[in-house]
């Protein structure tokens, strides 16, 4: 009863304590982190570049939205969750928002699950 739908999706929600935390994070960000994020974004985009179900990918860095051809985003979310992967929706898109520090191995594992779900025949 503590968390409401969507509550877990905000890293820095705007109150003074989290804003102070955000300032510390900004002090720690360096070019190496940004280069790693760009490489991870490229990996995500390349993974889905030839996936028929993916119409387009919007966003930047690791905050991405995947527009689907036919599948319903909510159905994909449920199927991913059943496989152990948490993804969100943003209207009719699949919303990806992994931590900036996600390892390449973890990212590839999650992308493989999502790719398998997207390549399954439509159950609807």
Model regions and ranges:
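Conserved N-terminal phosphate-binding loop of PLP-dependent enzymes in the Aspartate aminotransferase
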Residues: 1-124
């Amino acid at each position: 009863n503590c968390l409401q739908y969507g509550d877990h999706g905000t890293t820095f929600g705007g109150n003074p304590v989290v804003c102070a935390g955000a300032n510390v994070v900004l002090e720690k960000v360096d070019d190496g982190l940004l280069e790693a994020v760009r490489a991870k974004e490229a990996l995500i985009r390349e993974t889905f570049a030839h996936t028929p179900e993916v119409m387009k990918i919007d966003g930047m860095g690791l905050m991405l939205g995947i527009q689907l051809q036919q599948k319903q985003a909510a159905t994909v979310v449920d199927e991913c969750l059943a496989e152990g992967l948490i993804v969100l929706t943003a209207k009719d898109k699949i919303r990806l928002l992994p931590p900036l520090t996600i390892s390449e191995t973890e990212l590839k594992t999650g992308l493989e699950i999502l790719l398998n779900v997207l390549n399954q025949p439509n159950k609807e």
